[in-house]
Regions:
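Terminal RNA-binding accessory module
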Residues: 1-74, 111, 153, 373, ...
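Rossmann-like S-adenosyl-L-methionine
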Residues: 1-17, 222-468
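Short, acidic/hydrophobic/Gly-rich beta-strand patch recurrent on exposed beta strands
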Residues: 20-25, 149-152, 217-219, 360
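Short, conserved phosphate/pyrophosphate- and ester-handling motifs at nucleotide-, phospho-/glycolipid
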Residues: 38, 168, 298
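Extended interfacial segments that mediate partner engagement and assembly in macromolecular machines
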Residues: 59-70, 79-190, 210
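Short, solvent-exposed loop/turn elements at beta->coil junctions and helix N-caps
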Residues: 118-125, 193, 200-202, 447-450
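Internal alpha/beta scaffold segment
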Residues: 157-201, 222-254
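Structural signature of eukaryotic scaffold interfaces centered on beta-propeller domains
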Residues: 206-208
C-alpha cells in the first residue's frame, strides 16, 4: 500500500490515542484516526512507515452499530469530541479496553503479572462537565465572517463557532455568543496566524462547578489601530454583565499577548471588572483559581479521581501514613498533597511551574494546612536537594510521563509503596516497564474518565516493592 492510495475499510478496533484500525477487503490494515469500531470508512493513505500505513479519514460510509446517540450539531467538524455518537457506557468500555491492551502488551495480563484491574469509574456528569474553555478567534473559511470557537478537525487555521457546544453549560454558550456578537458588530479584526496582524486572539472562560463563580479573560494583541481600545473594552464588559447567567460573574479581565505562537501567553493582565480569581471546592477543600492556573477541567470528575487515588494510597488502614513523609512529585497546584496532608506528618510537593507552586502554597494556607511544603523546580534536579526522605511517593506527571533518569532517582529511595496517576496510557505503559524491571510490581489499576465524549482517560496504578 503506497502513499496516496484511496480505499475503504471497516474499523476493527480503536487503539489509544484515537487510532482506528481499518481492515480493507484485501485484509490490509490501515490506521485511521477519528473513527469508531464498526464504521465503514473511506481513507487516503498519507504515511507509510515500517510497512505500516496511516490514512486520513475522508468519509464515514456506514455508521457503526455502536452509534445510537444524537451528537452535538458541531460534531464531526469541531476537533474537540470524538465519541459523541456512542452511548456513554460503550465509551467507557472502549476506553477500558484500550488501556487494558496497552498495559498487558507492556507488562503482561492480570494473570501473568499478578495485578488486579479494578475497572473504570465514569464521570458524574456526561455533558456540560467542563469548568474551563479556551476559545479562539478566527474565521470558518478564508476571508469569512468572524468566528469564535474551536479549530476544525485537522485544520490549523479554520474555526468552528461552537455556540451549541455540549460539554459546557449554558453560561459558557451565552458568553461565547455575547462576545462574538459584540466584536462582529464593531468590525474588530482577529489576529491572523499567518500575517500576525489583527487584535482578537482568544477568549478564556472559567466557571467553578461548586460555587458558580465565573471569570472571563479576553486575550488580544496590542494592535489597536482604527478604534479606541478603552471604549471597546468598556462596551465588552457591559455586553457580558447585562446577560442572564445561572452562575455569577466574579471577574472580567483583559490579557495582552503579542507572541507569534498560537498559544495563550500572559504579557500583562488588567482587571476590567471584579477580581482576577475565583474559588472552587474539591472534597471539602477550597482552591483559588486564576485564568492561568492549572486545575482539572472536570471538577466532579476530579473528586472521583482524587478519592480513588486516596483509597489506593491508604487502603484499609486509614492511619497507614501517620508520622510519615509523603512526596507528591509533579504536584501542580497541590491538590493531592493537600488531600493527604491531614493523614501524614508532612507532604513535600515538587512542581516545575512556579505559578502553580505559588498557588499551591496559597491554597494550603487557605485550607489551614501547615504541613505542606512546595518546591519549584525540575523533579530530576530537586530530588538531589531535598533532605527529607520519603516514606511514600505519589507520581502525577504530565502527558509525556517521567524522565528515565528521574525514575532511577525515584526508585533509589526504595519506598515500599507508590501511586502513579497518569493522563496518558502510552507513557504510563512505558514507565511501568521500567519500574517492574527495577524491583516493583503492579498491585492494582483503575481508570477514571474525566473527559466524556473524547478519547482521553486517567489511570491510577498502585506499585509495591518486591525486593525488600
Amino acid at each position: 500500500m503506497k502513499k496516496g492510495f484511496r480505499g475503504t475499510g471497516t474499523v476493527e478496533r480503536v487503539d489509544f490515542p484515537n487510532k482506528g484500525i481499518a481492515v480493507t477487503d484485501d485484509g490490509d490494515r490501515v490506521i485511521v484516526k477519528n473513527t469508531i469500531p464498526g464504521q465503514k470508512v473511506e481513507f487516503v493513505v498519507n504515511k507509510v512507515k515500517h510497512q505500516r500505513a496511516e490514512g486520513r479519514l475522508m468519509e464515514v460510509i456506514e455508521k457503526s452499530p455502536l452509534e445510537t446517540e444524537e451528537p452535538c450539531p458541531h460534531f464531526g467538524m469541531c476537533g474537540g469530541c470524538t465519541y459523541q455518537t456512542v452511548p456513554y457506557e460503550k465509551q467507557l468500555d472502549m476506553k477500558l479496553t484500550q488501556v487494558k491492551k496497552l498495559i498487558s502488551d507492556a507488562i503482561g495480563t492480570e494473570k501473568e503479572a499478578g495485578y488486579e484491574f479494578i475497572g473504570i469509574h465514569g464521570s458524574p456528569k456526561k455533558s456540560e462537565y467542563r469548568n474551563k474553555m479556551e476559545f479562539s478567534f478566527g474565521d470558518e473559511y478564508k476571508d469569512g465572517p468572524l468566528a469564535l470557537g474551536m479549530h476544525k478537525r485537522g485544520s490549523f487555521y479554520d474555526l468552528v463557532t461552537v455556540s451549541d457546544c455540549q460539554i459546557v453549560d449554558e453560561d459558557f454558550r451565552t458568553i461565547l455568543k455575547a462576545t462574538l456578537d459584540y466584536f462582529s458588530k464593531n468590525n474588530i479584526p482577529y489576529f491572523h496566524r499567518a500575517t500576525h496582524k489583527g487584535y482578537l486572539r482568544h477568549l478564556l472562560v472559567r466557571k467553578a462547578t461548586k460555587t458558580g463563580e465565573i471569570i472571563v479573560d479576553l486575550v488580544t494583541s496590542t494592535q489597536t489601530e482604527g478604534f479606541n481600545e478603552e471604549e471597546l473594552l468598556a462596551g465588552f464588559r457591559y455586553e457580558l454583565l447585562t446577560r442572564h447567567y445561572d452562575g455569577r460573574f466574579k471577574g472580567v479581565l483583559h490579557t495582552k499577548n503579542d507572541s507569534v505562537a498560537d498559544v495563550v501567553k500572559n504579557e500583562g493582565t488588567e482587571v476590567l471588572y471584579g477580581d482576577s480569581y475565583f474559588y472552587e471546592e474539591l472534597l471539602g477543600l477550597k482552591f483559588k483559581i486564576t485564568p492561568f492556573s492549572f486545575f482539572q477541567t472536570n471538577s466532579l470528575g476530579a473528586e472521583v479521581l482524587y478519592e480513588t487515588a486516596r483509597e489506593f494510597i491508604l487502603g484499609d488502614d486509614k492511619d497507614s501514613l501517620n508520622g510519615k513523609t509523603v512526596y507528591d512529585l509533579y504536584s501542580g497546584t497541590g491538590t493531592i498533597a493537600q488531600l493527604m496532608a491531614p493523614v501524614c506528618k508532612e507532604v513535600v510537593g515538587v512542581e516545575i511551574v512556579e505559578e502553580a507552586v505559588c498557588a499551591a502554597k496559597e491554597n494550603a494556607a487557605l485550607n489551614g494546612l501547615d504541613n505542606c511544603k512546595f518546591i519549584a523546580g525540575d523533579v530530576l534536579k530537586v530530588l538531589d536537594e531535598i533532605e527529607e526522605k520519603p516514606d511514600y511517593i505519589i507520581l502525577d506527571p504530565p502527558r509525556d510521563g517521567i524522565h528515565p533518569k528521574a525514575i532511577g532517582k525515584i526508585i533509589e529511595y526504595g519506598v515500599e509503596n507508590m501511586v502513579y496517576i497518569s493522563c496518558k496510557p502510552t507513557s504510563l505503559a512505558r514507565d511501568l516497564q521500567i519500574f517492574m524491571d527495577r524491583g516493583y510490581r503492579v498491585e492494582k489499576i483503575c481508570c477514571v474518565d474525566m473527559f466524556p465524549n473524547t478519547y482521553h482517560i486517567e489511570t491510577i496504578v498502585a506499585l509495591h516493592r518486591t525486593d525488600l
